[in-house]
Amino acid sequence: MTLATRSLIKNLSSALGAQAEREQLIALISIATQTVAPLWPLDSAIAVNPLSGFEEQPFEEVLPEAAALFGARPTLSLNEWRTLMDEGRIDQVSLRKAVVNALGGPDEAFALLGPDLNAYNLLVARLLDMEAEDVPPVRRALSPGMATLARWLAAFFDRNAALRLPGRERGLYACLSEALRHDPALLRASNATGRAWLENAPADPVDMLILAARRDAVGPERRLPWLRAMVASLPGWAAHLRWRSEHAGPATSLGAPACMADLMALVALVQGVVQPAPRAVPDPDCPEDVEAALLVHCGVAQDAPAKWPEAGRARLRAVAALTHAQLGLIFQEAAESSFLGQLAPQLEGASARLAAPQSTLRPEAQAIFCIDVRSEPMRRALETQGRFETLGYAGFFGLPIAINPACAAPARNQLPVLLSPSHVVPERAMPGREAEATAMLARHAALGDAQAMLDTTKSGAIGFAAAEAAGPVAAVAMLARTLAPRLTHRLRQRLIGERGHVLAPAACNDQDHERHDGQGEGIPLAQRVAYARGMFALTGLSPQTARLVALVGHGGCTTNNAFAASLDCGACGGHPGGPNARLMAAILNDPAVRKGLAAKGVDLPHDTWFIAAQHDTTRDEVEIFDRHLVPASHVADLARFERALSCAGAQSRDERAARLDRTADDLLTGAAHWGEVRPEWGLSGNAAFIVGPRALTREVDLGGNAFLHSYDWKKDDDGSALTGIMTAPMIVAQWINCQYLFSTIDNEIFGAGDKTTQNVVGGFGVVQGSGGDLCTGLPRQSLFRDDGTPYHTPRRLAVIVHAPLQRVQDIVLRHDAVGRLVENGWVNLVVIDPWKHKAHHWVRGDWAVRPC
């Protein structure tokens, strides 16, 4: 709890009267809402830090607190950490440093307790040698009351996947409190007192919470943790509700209004009807028992400590008292140090080489990829094919847009969820392909209608008759998708057509952008120039570009995957980045924009042409868009570039297949197979966000574990470009990193569990089995190998910046969104000094010359 929160509670507690109590509770509800992060729906799923509401506290303090609140594990088990160490993901030197740090420094660690015995030996024994029993998480199954409430929540929030729940227009609390009064399962699970509580519930949710607080004798000082526990009792549904309240458009809530107070009140109502079962709190190792076991392990008599100085006995007690969370954090710090210890010296050497004169030869082509970690292997492979240069930029290419589809569908935001779209860009048929576009949209609509009809047959009274009629057809389709998935996929694509081949964002085929402004669509010339200039400023891309420059968005390609959007571009709101790449390429090829750029000092060569592409991260293939617009003078350049991309894709596919323990050909099959549970590792393994020129990392094999954002500090005099990078893409990368970290630590609570036992609910989320709480994180198959060992190493994001120390420090101190992550240890900030070429690690407000 922050000082500001404590002050608020104290001030409000001193007020008297019902109105003051109500105002206090409303203020606390707002704070308690932050207990969970927003959960985006499946069609625009993005990664978020599930503990983002705790970022104002130090990371090491949050782990046990959040574990207790959500009933989760605070860290991997000691046996899992030992497995990671056996695999070489933690080195001995880094573990030694982490142990010494945990003990307070070398003096404390190596002071003799007895003959040949010190605290360092004791702690290493606890970490590596002594028998370790996995401490179970403090979780409980949903009570009958909570399971019933979860079922009604699914009905209320449903997106037309089932029959409409009557009374939704009255709001979540009013609708469901009435439904619960008549729910037979809930009534059977309650007694007379519970039924009376249910029958006499107040009509207002805040009044309901006040009544429940008084009943449970929850005083003002205890009400915030009490409300947080309400949220944490159904964290998935609470997270969905937070997204709905804070990030969804008004249309989402139309006809079904809901707020977090409604959910808290319903939880309080149900808890009054059916008391939740107490959590089974595991018995932690008794420090005295651990102390005795340590002495036995080290061959020391049990009465020996009585002869030690008090300082020695205190050190023994301190090591024995370390909790499972504290031991796990030592391993985690060692894993982070191992990664940085290997990477930092390589970057220091590369920084020194940057001082030497660089080649002035014009590249054959340049490719600007998304910063996504999956771009790194493809970039590295492409650079081996010839004189190709690659850069990294946020995959929405700096365009704050929403795409208005040509079909009858809502506008789709193509930008980070931290931002709101400034422009709505219409999707239109390419010139001369209007008839083809009309036919393709009709086929898409027919396919959608058929899918809707199929979904309808899966429930309701018509399901039996429909199953009889549709069974033979469905059986043929099932066999085809199972036995020949790639062929089936190609036939399906040929039948319905490739949308990107006949439709495009309007700026890709309209020269007169301004004509859309009266309708609120399109981007005015001045802003198009600004967005184009921003790309050069943030990446450090020289205006002396290659003849061919590719803007490469990315997206995944999977079949029958509820989490498909999580493999698309997070910077594009969980959608493929192709539309943004096409729009930016069209902007940069526009003579009016070129003229505007030249006036601002960005004078592009007359023979430079920008093309748009999309990197399929599941198949390692790159699709080129709008090739019909490429001038005849650049056709040969494009052909050479495509050959290089094909070779790079094959190389990257081989590398990725080895990590998946599969063949490269099997990856192509898996992308089309509806039974594939692991089409790719996604962003598993992500460990670093590196900001600097490509020359800093070009000679380093980062193994697809790093976000790479191009940046040249010499071209950023006022630090504005670096500020933009650290306050937006870096924070998104930290969200991704934390989702992978916590989904690995406890996949049942912070993740989504096993894919094979999941069901989609309401069209927006997944649950395990037939119902219950919404899953908030990543499925097990995205993080763990088939044998159960973690593929992803849980470690905090290493933010590595090649820039002057003072410039980075100013940003950390000036921007709270960055400062709290750095100061509270949610990221490890490392700066490579561009003059002395040394890595400096920010440790609680000061710089250390070597990373931890």
From Swiss-Prot:
Transmembrane segments: none annotated. Its main location: membrane. It is found in: Cell inner membrane. GO terms for cellular component: plasma membrane. It is a peripheral membrane protein. Coiled coil: none annotated. Zn(2+) binds at C370, D372, H554, C569. It comes from the Bacteria. One of its GO terms (molecular function) is zinc ion binding. Forms a complex with DabB. Part of an energy-coupled inorganic carbon pump. This is Probable inorganic carbon transporter subunit DabA. The lineage of its organism: Bacteria, Pseudomonadati, Pseudomonadota, Alphaproteobacteria, Sphingomonadales.
